C-alpha cells in the first residue's frame, strides 16, 4: 500500500520531518550492495510486508515508498558536504525525485555553536571555517530547494566548547561572524537554492538588533 500523506496535509501548515542521517543511510546504502558482504541489510532481516525492500521506507520515493510525504528537512550538520564524492549513505537525498519532493536544508549552525565545526569564524580567511562555509553553500546549491543561512547561534558564547572552538565570546562577535558567512554566500551562490534568514537573539535587545 502506498499512502499519500502529502494530500492529507493540504489544509495545514507543512510539517517538515527531520530526516536523520541514520535513516537516510539505510535507504541509501541498501541501493549499493557490497561486492563481498552483499546488501547493507540482508534479505533475512527485511520484513515480509516491505514490497520494495528498504525502499519501502523511502517516503520521498513516490512509486516505491510504502507511504509518501513531499516535504522534509535535512541538516548539513550530518551530511557528506563534498558534492564530488560518491556517498551511498546520502543517496536518498542526492537522488531524490526533485519534481515531487521539497527539501529544506539546515545549515549546521548548531554544530558551530557546539564546537563540532572548529575554526576562527570571526576571520573570513580561516581555512577551517572557510572549508565548512564553502562546503555547506555548495551542498545547499546542489541538493536543497530552500536553505537556512549559516548563522552563528547567539548562545555560542555561553557554550564552553563552542566559545573555545570558534573564538567567539560575545553576541556581537556571533553577529559579525554570521555576516561574514552571509557575505560569502551572497557573492558565491549559484541561485539554485533559495535562502531563508535566521533570527538570533536571547533577549528583546538582541531581537531588535
Where does each model-flagged region fall?
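Non-catalytic, usually N-terminal nucleic-acid engagement modules in DNA/RNA processing proteins
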Residues: 1-184
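Glycine-rich phosphate/ribose-binding loops and adjacent secondary-structure elements
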Residues: 2-6, 190-209
Amino acid at each position: 500500500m502506498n499512502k499519500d500523506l502529502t494530500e492529507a496535509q493540504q489544509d495545514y501548515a507543512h510539517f517538515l520531518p527531520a530526516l536523520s542521517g541514520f535513516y537516510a543511510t539505510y535507504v541509501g546504502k541498501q541501493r549499493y550492495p557490497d561486492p563481498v558482504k552483499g546488501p547493507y541489510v540482508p534479505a533475512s532481516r527485511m520484513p515480509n510486508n516491505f514490497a520494495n525492500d528498504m525502499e519501502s521506507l523511502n517516503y520521498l520515493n513516490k512509486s516505491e515508498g510504502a507511504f509518501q510525504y513531499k516535504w522534509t528537512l535535512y541538516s548539513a550538520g550530518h551530511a557528506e558536504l563534498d558534492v564530488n564524492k560518491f556517498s551511498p549513505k546520502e543517496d536518498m537525498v542526492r537522488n531524490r525525485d526533485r519534481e515531487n519532493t521539497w527539501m529544506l536544508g539546515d545549515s549546521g549552525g548548531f554544530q558551530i555553536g557546539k564546537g563540532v565545526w572548529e575554526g576562527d569564524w570571526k576571520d573570513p580567511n580561516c581555512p577551517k571555517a572557510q572549508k565548512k562555509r564553502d562546503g555547506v553553500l555548495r551542498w545547499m546549491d546542489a541538493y536543497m530547494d530552500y536553505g537556512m543561512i549559516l548563522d552563528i547561534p547567539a548562545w555560542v558564547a555561553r557554550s564552553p566548547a563552542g566559545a573555545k572552538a570558534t573564538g567567539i565570546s560575545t553576541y556581537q562577535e556571533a553577529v559579525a561572524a554570521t555576516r561574514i558567512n552571509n557575505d560569502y554566500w551572497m557573492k558565491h551562490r549559484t541561485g539554485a537554492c533559495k535562502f531563508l534568514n535566521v533570527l538570533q537573539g536571547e533577549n528583546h535587545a538582541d531581537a531588535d538588533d
